[in-house]
Amino acid sequence: MTPSNYQRTRWLTLIGTIITQFALGSVYTWSLFNGALSAKLDAPVSQVAFSFGLLSLGLAISSSVAGKLQERFGVKRVTMASGILLGLGFFLTAHSDNLMMLWLSAGVLVGLADGAGYLLTLSNCVKWFPERKGLISAFAIGSYGLGSLGFKFIDTQLLETVGLEKTFVIWGAIALLMIVFGATLMKDAPKQEVKTSNGVVEKDYTLAESMRKPQYWMLAVMFLTACMSGLYVIGVAKDIAQSLAHLDVVSAANAVTVISIANLSGRLVLGILSDKIARIRVITIGQVISLVGMAALLFAPLNAVTFFAAIACVAFNFGGTITVFPSLVSEFFGLNNLAKNYGVIYLGFGIGSICGSIIASLFGGFYVTFYVIFALLILSLALSTTIRQPEQKMLREAHGSL
């Protein structure tokens, strides 16, 4: 590939990834539909909302096998299939007449489709820009976050004008077309050459090799903690506002806007910063910010200002962590197997999405979950300040040996 073609191909891949990520991020408008689906199915909102928990779990599971899918079929085909399955999932959701069908379509099918496209396109795009990994992650994951904001207005307008069932059909069609079009612009990133620095081989670890390193599980704990704290607070922010900060319904609803802005800010600020300083130090900064926010929720007298500041801190770290982590994992274990190595760590997203709710349901209230998250943040902070990269292999001068 000539230098000019290489540049053109990677920038087209970036554009396709941004379009695809924007459409995939639309699933985070799900809370808009809980009330209408509850009325349609004559089921409690909590049972309807469980479909989003299944979606998050399915997303994490399919992300963990995205690397193997890319190896066999290529990024373009897998992304197109992801878009088609996502559109099908929304179509089936529109025609769901019971909870089980809703859970299978909106939860399992949409989640699996979304996860396959999300991590695959992200890791492939990062490989095209090894010199700007943080910035490219910020662009890609930032567009995923913007998708929830953009489709919030689209879906709200559709609900008001065409009703619930047609909204799902149109939403699915728009997402399908965007993802398939984005996929046509993408190409698989070339395999990265093994680099050497001062006689040291920068090794590309396979998944099996990575999982034998303690650093892999240290990173996994940090990622799980950020996801658990962010997803739990995002899920119950409105309830915390009313129960603990004693805000009225209108003021409490502003928590969604605050979280969206903080989440996106974390993705952009920490993502760009990760190209300037050591990425693990960026994770440490995010952990400190989240720790301050969680401490405020636990120990500070909550009013509108302290509450919004606290949840903003947690959401900022969550957005920043999921942006920086793909590049961080590639820094520790190499770029060539990033989709596989990050895919297993990304299971922490699915596990974290349900852990907070399980703890809260077992012990009642918010505070026990907050204390668990607070303790995990302290542990994660200790890990991020002590972790070191795996030892690399030294090149020997002797002929034919390493």
Swiss-Prot record:
It is a multi-pass membrane protein. One of its GO terms (cellular component) is plasma membrane. One of its GO terms (molecular function) is transmembrane transporter activity. It is found in: Cell inner membrane. It comes from Escherichia coli (strain K12). The keyword Cell inner membrane applies. Part of a nutrient-sensing regulatory network composed of the two-component regulatory systems BtsS/BtsR and YpdA/YpdB, and their respective target proteins, BtsT and YhjX. The keyword Transmembrane applies. Its main location: membrane. This is Uncharacterized MFS-type transporter YhjX. The gene is yhjX. Induction: Induced by the two-component regulatory system YpdA/YpdB in response to pyruvate. Regulated at post-transcriptional level by CsrA. It comes from the Bacteria. Residues 35-43, 96-99, 155-168, 237-250, 303-306, 365-367 are periplasmic. Interacts with BtsS and YpdA. Residues 1-11, 67-72, 123-134, 187-216, 274-279, 330-341, 388-402 are cytoplasmic. Pfam families: MFS_1. The chain crosses the membrane at residues 12-34, 44-66, 73-95, 100-122, 135-154, 169-186, 217-236, 251-273, 280-302, 307-329, 342-364, 368-387. GO terms for biological process: cellular response to nutrient levels.
